[in-house]
Amino acid sequence: MAEKRNIFLVGPMGAGKSTIGRHLAQQLHMEFLDSDTVIEERTGADIAWVFDVEGEEGFRIREEGVINDLTQEQGIVLATGGGSVISKESRNRLSARGVVVYLETTIEKQLARTQRDKKRPLLQTDEPREVLEALAKERNALYEEVSDYVVRTDDQSAKVVANQIIQMLEER
């Protein structure tokens, strides 16, 4: 992969976007960015606080702005938030400004990977499985719509998935 084109990772929470993104960026000698981390840096507060104070709608407005800004960078690997594809504008920007890889995983893996994470406001409920199932129903088609590639992450290490993505990009 001679040119350093942007790589955008989309998928549900717990799919491994941040972990795989770090491996991918390191192996490709690219900068790694995480849209949720950038939102926290810009607001000076964590995502849960933004959700509490501004609600999901306020968070999504911030997220759309961050996606717009970050997708204009060059030579980055970007891990997006699980809900970033809700915005048509964000989907258009992701598609137009880089290669989009959908990291797909099962509800069971999502539950296992997120069960102790208190930084996920949508999962602060007694029924996280139901929430994840509802989110999958709402978002999976959007992930597929925006993606150039789909990679299943269930039983593979982040390093293996990163290598699979690199191989796909080299064959492109």
Curated annotation (Swiss-Prot):
Family membership noted in the UniProt record: Belongs to the shikimate kinase family.
Enzyme class: transferase
EC code: 2.7.1.71
UniProt entry keywords in alphabetical sequence: Amino-acid biosynthesis, Aromatic amino acid biosynthesis, ATP-binding, Cytoplasm, Kinase, Magnesium, Metal-binding, Nucleotide-binding, Transferase
Disulphide bonds in the chain: none
PANTHER family in alphabetical order: SHIKIMATE KINASE, SHIKIMATE KINASE 1, CHLOROPLASTIC
Chief location category: cytoplasm
One Pfam family, short name: SKI
Protein known as: Shikimate kinase
Residues binding Mg(2+), per UniProt: 18
GO MF annotation, one: magnesium ion binding
Residues at which ATP binds: 14-19, 120, 156
GO cellular component: cytosol
Gene: aroK
Cofactor: Mg(2+)
Cofactor note: Binds 1 Mg(2+) ion per subunit.
GO BP annotations, alphabetical order: amino acid biosynthetic process; aromatic amino acid family biosynthetic process; chorismate biosynthetic process
Residues involved in substrate binding: 36, 60, 82, 139
InterPro entries, per database record: P-loop_NTPase, Shikimate/glucono_kinase, Shikimate_kinase/TSH1, Shikimate_kinase_CS
Glycoprotein found in the keyword field: no
